[in-house]
């Protein structure tokens, strides 16, 4: 089991990143919440990981905060939810916001997260309500991202399941001159939840 990786960030392009640990490059899939706060390529990084092995595949997921990894694991315990939707949850809302939505039973807001319909949202509320208070996001880590924020945000939104035209519109509407990628993505996802 691989629980944590510490190394040099060698590559990042949502949803994938590569960490060089002693000359071995570990490829991980990560939610946008992690990408928001990653350091620049070539810098040291520590990620909490989740190792998943299925009959025909092996996957490694990375998170900057233990609370994100815990939420990722807990969301997958809900009937009918897998890693793809768990990543969409972490990409769409913060851990604290998700806990608030579950505690308050806000089905409408949950259905705005890509891949979550009304029945899935209802199941999530029922199955996670008792554990919602245990979700903790931890302290944020500051990160810097590239200059062409709208273009990079468009690609990231497509990776989250939005159609190319919709992703481009969302990024364009959310972006302002000089914005970082994380800011554009965050604004676009928040606008989609309204």
Swiss-Prot record:
Bridged cysteine pairs (disulfide): none
Chain spans, region Flexible linker: 140-144
SUPFAM superfamilies: DNA helicase RuvA subunit, C-terminal domain, Nucleic acid-binding proteins, RuvA domain 2-like
Region entry Domain I, spans: 1-64
Classification via Gene3D superfamilies: 5' to 3' exonuclease, C-terminal subdomain, DNA helicase RuvA subunit, C-terminal domain, Nucleic acid-binding proteins
Region (Domain III): 145-194
Coiled-coil zones: none
Annotated region described as Domain II, given as residue ranges: 65-140
Domain of life: Bacteria
UniProt keyword Transport present: no
Gene Ontology biological process: DNA recombination; DNA repair
Cross-referenced InterPro entries: DNA_helicase_Holl-junc_RuvA_I (IPR013849), Hlx-hairpin-Hlx_DNA-bd_motif (IPR003583), NA-bd_OB-fold (IPR012340), RuvA (IPR000085), RuvA_2-like (IPR010994), RuvA_C (IPR011114), RuvA_C_sf (IPR036267)
Protein localization: Cytoplasm
MF annotations from Gene Ontology: ATP binding; four-way junction DNA binding; four-way junction helicase activity
Annotated Pfam families: HHH_5, RuvA_C, RuvA_N
UniProtKB keywords: Cytoplasm, DNA damage, DNA recombination, DNA repair, DNA-binding
GO cellular component, one term: Holliday junction resolvase complex
Family: Belongs to the RuvA family.
NCBIfam families xrefs: ruvA
Comment field on protein domains: Has three domains with a flexible linker between the domains II and III and assumes an 'L' shape. Domain III is highly mobile and contacts RuvB.
Subunit relationships: Homotetramer. Forms an RuvA(8)-RuvB(12)-Holliday junction (HJ) complex. HJ DNA is sandwiched between 2 RuvA tetramers; dsDNA enters through RuvA and exits via RuvB. An RuvB hexamer assembles on each DNA strand where it exits the tetramer. Each RuvB hexamer is contacted by two RuvA subunits (via domain III) on 2 adjacent RuvB subunits; this complex drives branch migration. In the full resolvosome a probable DNA-RuvA(4)-RuvB(12)-RuvC(2) complex forms which resolves the HJ.
Function as written in the Swiss-Prot or TrEMBL entry: The RuvA-RuvB-RuvC complex processes Holliday junction (HJ) DNA during genetic recombination and DNA repair, while the RuvA-RuvB complex plays an important role in the rescue of blocked DNA replication forks via replication fork reversal (RFR). RuvA specifically binds to HJ cruciform DNA, conferring on it an open structure. The RuvB hexamer acts as an ATP-dependent pump, pulling dsDNA into and through the RuvAB complex. HJ branch migration allows RuvC to scan DNA until it finds its consensus sequence, where it cleaves and resolves the cruciform DNA.
Protein name, per record: Holliday junction branch migration complex subunit RuvA
């Amino acid at each position: 089991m691989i629980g944590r990786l510490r190394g040099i960030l060698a590559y990042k392009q949502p949803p994938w990143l590569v960490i060089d640990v002693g000359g071995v490059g570990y490829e991980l899939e990560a939610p946008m919440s992690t990408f928001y706060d990653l350091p620049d390529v070539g810098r040291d990084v520590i990620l909490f990981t989740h190792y998943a092995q299925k009959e025909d595949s092996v996957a490694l997921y990375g998170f900057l905060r233990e609370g994100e990894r815990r939420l990722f694991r807990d969301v997958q315990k809900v009937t009918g939810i897998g890693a793809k939707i768990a990543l969409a949850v972490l990409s769409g809302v913060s851990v604290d916001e998700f806990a608030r939505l579950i505690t308050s039973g806000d089905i409408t807001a949950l259905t705005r997260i890509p891949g979550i319909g009304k029945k899935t949202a209802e199941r999530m509320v029922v199955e996670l309500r008792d554990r919602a208070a245990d979700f903790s996001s931890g302290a944020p880590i500051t990160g810097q991202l590239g200059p062409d924020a709208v273009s990079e945000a468009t690609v990231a939104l497509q990776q989250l399941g939005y159609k190319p035209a919709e992703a481009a519109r969302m990024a364009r509407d959310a972006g302002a001159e000089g914005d970082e990628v994380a800011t554009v993505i965050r604004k676009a996802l928040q606008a989609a939840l309204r």
